[in-house]
Amino acid sequence: MSVKPNALVTGATSGIGEATADRLQAAGYRVFAIGRNPEALQALSLRGLTAHALDVTDEAAVEQLVDEIDGGVDVLVNCAGFPLTCPLEQVALSDLRLLFETNIVAALHLSQAVLPGMRERGSGVIVNIGSTGGRFASPGAGGYHVVKYGMEALSLSLRAEVAPFGVRVVLLDPTAVRTPFVTSQQEAQPVYAPDDPYGDFKRRYADYTRRLSAKRGVMIEPDTVARAVLRVVRAKNPRPRYIVGRSGKATVFARALVTDRMWDRILMRGLHD
């Protein structure tokens, strides 16, 4: 009887992480699903996944979990994160720090925790979930872009460093994904203070985002990303990074064709008219 390979998935209680955990389990992996929502974790357990309540920013807890996984981690998928939309002048630094700790520092620490075992075995895959928001920047979500640009650098640097040990690091950059968190943000009807200097901009940004998301083909489902994760995990020689979603590919391609000044005008025309 063959031993199932181990996969560790963060942010597994919803969205991309949950879909990825399910896909990997169906593909024959023993999946350790990490999250913080008790009800969602219980549901994962009922589906046969090994669910753990864990804050990825808790370094001691992360190291303890990795040490307890019999046979080591063969596949690590870093999915934990959350959106952050706010003009940069008004963004709460505590929110930005938390996003950076959750998305970048935790991803690096988890990689550090699993790499010794991967190096010893001479194999392993680390998949980082980035965003097309790491390929270009736009107003209204500057803090999110800052962190996603960081994920690009983390993944590409780490990939080159660990490749000689037989470890593959791959970055997936999805376009907008229809997750419960994103949907709730789009459906919200916030009220802005009359003296908010960014009030008009925020209303335009929210309206623009809703209209764009309603267009066919703009947003993708979490399972689309999960299927991409499974493909790169199975690939013998995956590329350093992939864009997931046609709309994301089109936007990144268009950005590459125009100058910085032209891109600047496009963004301001879309959100300030």
Task: Annotate each PLM feature.
Residues 54-64, 93:
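The beta1-alpha1 cofactor-binding region of Rossmann-like NAD(H)/NADP(H)-dependent oxidoreductases
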Residues 13-14:
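Conserved glycine-rich cofactor-binding loop
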Residues 164-215:
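C-terminal beta-strand-loop-alpha-helix "lid" module of Rossmann-like NAD(P)-dependent dehydrogenases
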Residues 131:
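Residue(s) in the substrate-gating loop at a strand-loop-helix junction
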Residues 111, 147-150:
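Active-site helix of classical SDR
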Residues 111-112, 156:
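A short, exposed helix-loop element centered on a Lys and neighboring polar residues
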